[in-house]
Amino acid sequence: MFEKVRKIIAEQLGIEEDEITMESSFIDDLGADSLDIVELIMALEEEFDLEIPDSEAEKITTVGDVVEYIKNNS
């Protein structure tokens, strides 16, 4: 699961996969801005065939948050 999420994040943000850990913050560590995060959420929704409501997306700040959300909701 983490590897699949990491690959999508790397593609969306144009960074190397080895820069991404479960603890990585999208904004602080990976340099994402709010538009990057919206696009990333959309890519993850498509890849994992789920919908992440805005209220939940706002709580997702790290890679681990995304992985946990997908595990609990797919």
UniProtKB/Swiss-Prot annotation:
Involved pathway(s): Lipid metabolism; fatty acid biosynthesis
Keyword Phosphoprotein in annotation: yes
Presence of the UniProt keyword Plastid in the record: no
Classification via Pfam families: PP-binding
GO biological process: lipid A biosynthetic process
Localisation per UniProt entry: Cytoplasm
Carrier domain: residues covered: 1-74
Gene Ontology terms, MF aspect: acyl binding; acyl carrier activity; phosphopantetheine binding
Main location as per UniProt: cytoplasm
O-(pantetheine 4'-phosphoryl)serine: residues carrying this PTM: S34
PTM per Swiss-Prot/TrEMBL: 4'-phosphopantetheine is transferred from CoA to a specific serine of apo-ACP by AcpS. This modification is essential for activity because fatty acids are bound in thioester linkage to the sulfhydryl of the prosthetic group.
UniProt xrefs under InterPro entries: ACP, ACP-like_sf, PKS_PP-bd, PP-bd_ACP, Ppantetheine_attach_site
Summary of the function given for this chain in its UniProt record: Carrier of the growing fatty acid chain in fatty acid biosynthesis.
HAMAP family assigned to the protein according to its UniProt record, in alphabetical order: Acyl_carrier
Protein name: Acyl carrier protein
